[in-house]
């Protein structure tokens, strides 16, 4: 899979008009048709504060749920579980049934709070971009938004970031000021060294001491079988595991038309490539890699979602919220 770990070229987003863009993103969140503009990664890249970014994304996402394809689903479901035959009807939420035509049982507050551990791949390959938003930035946006959303649900949030080792670890807590600590650690992350993804996920599994939800955000450039075994380790302890596979669109589509020099972002090995010769084989290799990850995740009851860095964040937030509601 090393042939997939490539940095073709590094592009940098323009900083001009940054302050105006931040204000526009907040004041005019619905400035485009379709997905809310505040969920667009390129707009988010112009907001310098992760705390402001996360609050803007999550509050906009939650308020927009009733207008979305996910009609009838909202964060209140995190305090419910689906009705099962034999459940005491005294605890059926009749008001929710009337609004949504769905049968849910209320859960006590003590039963609804869980630990959410967010694991971020900060290896060198996460620097790659052709859209102006690197995979690392997208992971930071996503992790910050998930941390804010989990805190909004009264969950304890923890963070781990890794490349060849776990270099950042904030244990899960739910106390005043903790979310700001999480934001600060996420903001300081820099994509750096070579990764040993599977090995590091095994180490992360040993650090999670209480059952909860584990979110893994990575480009998953490692042997798929080794990755699945590591995810099984996370899952084995009774955790619900959500995999967010983040790639640049060009990594999946390989849209180069001219000869190009490819450089492995972690080993710095370079190779000259003729796109006409490589393109089909490359796309097939990527497709096979993704399919093996998706199938392995499904076999182990792990949620798998593939995102390119141009994709709005609402898809990821809904996936997280849906998994959280099953707790």
PLM feature segments, named:
Residues 2-17, 34-174, 213-217, 223-225, ...:
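An amphipathic, basic-hydrophobic helix/alpha-beta surface used to engage anionic
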Residues 217-218, 307:
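Thr-Gly-centered strand-to-loop micro-motif
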Residues 1-19, 34-69, 79, 206-212, ...:
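Von Willebrand factor type A / integrin I
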Residues 141-145, 195-202, 225, 291, ...:
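Short, contiguous clusters of charged residues that form electrostatic/catalytic patches at enzyme active sites
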Residues 178-212, 224-225, 248:
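Von Willebrand factor
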Residues 137, 191-198, 221, 284-287:
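Conserved phosphate-coordination/catalytic loops
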Residues 16, 24-33:
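Arg/Gly-rich low-complexity intrinsically disordered repeat tracts
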């Amino acid at each position: 899979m090393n042939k997939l770990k490539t940095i073709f070229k590094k592009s940098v987003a323009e900083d001009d008009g940054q302050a105006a863009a931040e204000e526009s993103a907040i004041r005019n969140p619905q400035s485009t048709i379709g997905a809310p503009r505040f969920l667009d990664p390129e707009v988010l890249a112009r907001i310098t504060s992760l705390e402001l970014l996360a609050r803007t994304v999550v509050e906009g996402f939650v308020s927009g749920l009733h207008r979305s394809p996910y009609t009838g689903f909202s964060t209140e479901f995190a305090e419910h579980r689906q009705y099962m035959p034999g459940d005491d009807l005294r605890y059926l939420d009749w008001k929710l049934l009337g609004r949504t035509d769905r049968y849910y049982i209320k859960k006590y507050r003590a039963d609804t709070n869980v630990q959410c551990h967010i694991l971020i791949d900060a290896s060198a390959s996460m620097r790659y971009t052709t859209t102006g938003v690197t995979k690392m930035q997208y992971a930071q946006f996503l992790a910050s938004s998930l941390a804010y959303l989990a805190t909004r649900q009264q969950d304890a949030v923890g963070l781990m970031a890794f490349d060849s080792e776990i270099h950042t670890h904030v244990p899960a807590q739910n106390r005043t000021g903790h979310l700001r600590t999480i934001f600060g650690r996420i903001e300081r992350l820099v994509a750096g060294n070579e990764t040993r993804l599977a090995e590091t996920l095994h180490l992360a599994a040993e650090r999670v001491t209480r059952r909860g939800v584990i979110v893994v955000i990575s480009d998953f450039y490692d042997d798929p079988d080794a990755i699945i075994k590591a995810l099984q380790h996370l899952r084995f302890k009774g955790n619900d595991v959500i995999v967010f596979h983040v790639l640049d669109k060009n990594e999946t589509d390989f849209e180069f038309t001219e000869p190009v020099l490819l450089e492995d972002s972690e080993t710095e090995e370079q190779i000259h490539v003729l796109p006409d010769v490589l393109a089909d084989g490359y796309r097939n290799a990527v497709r096979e890699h993704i399919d093996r990850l998706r199938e392995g995740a499904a076999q182990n009851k792990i949620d798998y979602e593939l995102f390119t860095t141009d994709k709005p964040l609402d898809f990821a937030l809904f996936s997280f919220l849906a998994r959280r509601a099953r707790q």
